[in-house]
Amino acid sequence: MKLISWNINGFRSLMNRTLLDAFARLDADVYCLQETKLQAGQGELDLPGFTGIWNYADRPGYSGTAVLTLRTPVFSRFGLCEDETDTQGRVITADLGDFYLVNAYAPNVAADLSRLPERIAWNDALLRHLQALDAQKPVILCGDLNAAYNDADLAGKSQGMHVPGFTREERSGMAALLQSGFVDAYRYVHPDTAPGAFAYRKGIRAGGLDYFLVSARMVERIVDANAHPRIRGSDHYPMELVIR
């Protein structure tokens, strides 16, 4: 099974044809999209054979997530376990039979770090949500987690802990996920990748913000994990995970 996670930075700005062309090249079984910036009725993508799950933000042109899957979900729900309303459209959880899939778009702390308290609370809620799911069966978390936990992921930035996505608190949130038993699939497959090998278009390596994290007991199912820097249309690269 091939899964793709991609922050598309606006569904309407990418346009259907560009997205369809990218999907044809990626040829995946599951697409997890972040920052769709859609509201209901604004142009969902209809892929033959795929089930589409769309989570909208209340605020127009903001946030939003989607899952398009060939495997019909047993069920899906929005938000974290403590926030079923998810007014910002940030999280979709889908039961795909032998594992849970969680597609997430983490809050950005803002350039002045003014939203850092919100982000800390969100990180804590995400961890509790994942732990509750993982107690039942394995979990794959993917998405734009807006945090670079590895020093190698911050390319060409000297401000260190004052850079959004690289603050001590955000890195601690990522560390908590990894310490709780989740594994960074990209780093598992490519432990010795040189810094900046997959550069996020604004200066941070793609894997420095965008991830596939899997339950430790799913590691043996990982076949491959990669980024796709040649796929254009967004300021993020699509990330890929292949499992058996």
Model-derived segments and spans:
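Structured beta-strand-rich core segments of catalytic domains in phosphoester-bond hydrolases
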Residues: 37, 42-109
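Metal-dependent phosphoesterases centered on the DNase I-like endonuclease/exonuclease/phosphatase
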Residues: 51, 122-205, 209
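Active-site-proximal beta-strand elements of phosphoester/diester hydrolases
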Residues: 1-9, 98-108, 142
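Conserved beta strand-loop-helix elements of the APE1-like EEP
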Residues: 60-75, 200-221
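Surface-exposed cleft-lining segments at the edges of enzyme active sites
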Residues: 81-82, 106-123, 159-162
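Active-site beta-strand termini and strand-to-loop segments that position acidic
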Residues: 70, 94-97, 215-216, 234, ...
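Active-site beta-strand/loop signature of hydrolases that rely on acidic residues for catalysis
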Residues: 6-7, 23-41, 101, 130-153, ...
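N-terminal, active-site-proximal structural segment of metallo-dependent hydrolase catalytic domains
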Residues: 1-47, 57-63
